[in-house]
Structure formats: structure tokens, C-alpha cells
Amino acid sequence: MSVITISRGSYSRGKEVAEKTALKLGYECISRDILLEASEEFNIPEIRLIRALHDSPSVLERFTHGRERYVSYIRKALLQHVQKDNVVYHGLAGHYFLLNIPHVLKVRIIADMEERVKEEVRRENLSEEKALYILKSR
């Protein structure tokens, strides 16, 4: 196996797991770099690429296929890395972008709510009640 993609819920330490896995295996670890590469190569602001993944297409985008074009830019940047093999990807939509590639191990990390609350408290310096409220509202 030469490609691992890791998806995660918020505050489940997916980045940490991905980086340690890549280090242990001697693989390249990639994430947001893909968006930056696509943004630079196709001269598209990074925020537009992020919105293409998160938001519903606008009326204009439905007619111009803007969303599909942006998604294909991101996929191209990711596939350029995957072709080299020995990659751990932990960025946006990895399971989607690598859907029909047979030599990909797809991992989903889910942390229990108690661990997520602790991590939110640690990172954001919040009370446990406020952290729990924020996590439940996502």
C-alpha cells in the first residue's frame, strides 16, 4: 500500500496521527499544501477552492461549472503527489478525491466527545461548558 488518506472530525488529532504515520513509514505528509499548489498553478484564490468544497454552488456556478472546475484543480494537485506513491494525505475531501484508486487506505478518525471537549478547551482556552456547546453546534 502506498497511499493513506485520513479524514477526521474536529479536534480528533487527525493531523497529529497523519504526521506521525508519515514519519514512521517514511512517507510524504500533505494537507493544505494541495490547495496552495492548485491556487498557484491555476491562479485561483485559495478561498474560492475552499468554498468549492464546502458551499453549495451559486446560480452562476451552476451554469459556468465553476465549482466542478475548482474541484478538478484540487484533485489534479493531489493526484500529482499520489502518483509518486508513499503519501499520507489529511486534507479536505481526501476520500472523495481518491475515490476510485485501488491502492489507497482510507482511514476515518473519530474521537469521543469528552476527548474533543478537552482538546477544544486546551486549544481555545474555553470553559468545558462553552467548548461542549461549540462542538455540539457544529
Language-model regions: role of each:
Residues 24-30:
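Post-Walker A helix-loop "phosphate-sensing" segment adjacent to the P-loop in P-loop NTPases
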Residues 18, 88, 116:
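Residue-level signature of catalytic and energy-coupling elements of molecular machines
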Residues 3, 29, 104-106:
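Conserved beta-strand scaffold positions in the cores of enzyme catalytic domains, especially
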Residues 33-86, 93, 126:
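ATP-dependent small-molecule kinase phosphotransfer cores
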Residues 8-9, 91-92, 138:
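Fold-independent oxyanion-binding glycine-rich loops
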Residues 100-123, 128-137:
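Conserved phosphate-donor/acceptor-positioning beta-strand/loop module used by diverse small-molecule
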Residues 5-21:
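Glycine-rich phosphate-binding P-loop
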